[in-house]
Amino acid sequence: MAKKSTSRLPKRKGEYTFRGKTVAQLQEMSFEDFAELLPAKERRSIRRGFSDSQKGVLQQFRDGKESVRTHFRNMIIFPEMIGKNLEVYNGKEFVKIEIMPEMIGHRFGEYSPTRNRVSHGSAGVGATRSSKFVPLK
């Protein structure tokens, strides 16, 4: 009897595909054709059109700019952006991102977290009742 693989993740063979399409096929598609492959929320966002400033960000990608800085966290990552560098503002600083094929269809903000995990240190002297009687060093 053949032994089954216990891994739940699909094994990666060859190049990346998005909904059955290779990256080269995706890059040849128009926005409307690509939108048909996306979930409903992203598809509706594309059909509603882009603002002038969002069109400016897309134009910077097309012009081959080395790194694009933006505050647009809700913009969708398109196949033509693959391999480019992006800097997304998280409210404090610009977070550098290199766009990979696995990021297609996601939004810029997903890769630029706005909140960091807080790791608190130990309590100070006098912070708790038991620490009042601890001698200072």
From Swiss-Prot:
Molecular-function GO term, any one: structural constituent of ribosome
PROSITE patterns: RIBOSOMAL_S19 (PS00323)
UniProt keyword annotation of DNA-binding present: no
Keywords assigned by UniProt, alphabetized: Ribonucleoprotein, Ribosomal protein, RNA-binding, rRNA-binding
Pfam entry (one): Ribosomal_S19
UniProt-annotated stretches for the region Disordered: 115-137
GO CC terms: cytosolic small ribosomal subunit
SUPFAM superfamilies assigned: Ribosomal protein S19 (SSF54570)
UniProt record, GO biological process: ribosomal small subunit assembly; translation
Superkingdom: Archaea
Keyword flag rRNA-binding: yes
Record family assignment: Belongs to the universal ribosomal protein uS19 family.
Record's function text: Protein S19 forms a complex with S13 that binds strongly to the 16S ribosomal RNA.
Xref: NCBIfam families: PRK04038.1, uS19_arch
Protein name: Small ribosomal subunit protein uS19
Organism: Methanococcoides burtonii (strain DSM 6242 / NBRC 107633 / OCM 468 / ACE-M)
Name of the gene: rps19
